[in-house]
């Protein structure tokens, strides 16, 4: 989907709540297959079962620069250890 400058987290849900799978940041994009082209997409599906079981959280940061967004993503990764995170 089209997005402006954001930090995003992909989740799946189980009985105990939402499980973070992947966190990242993005500049503005109009790429419709932005998420499905992610290198970790197969891992997301393995954990969620199907695309419909994936959830997306977005933190809009319209006036931000990439280093600021990266700092936020690094904090998220450090605290929540998303299951499909690759660096």
Regions found by a protein language model. Name each.
Residues 1-34, 60-78:
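GIY-YIG nuclease catalytic motif and its immediate N-terminal context
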Residues 31-50, 55:
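A broadly used, surface-exposed interaction patch
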Residues 82-87:
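Coupling/hinge elements of helicase-like and P-loop NTPase modules
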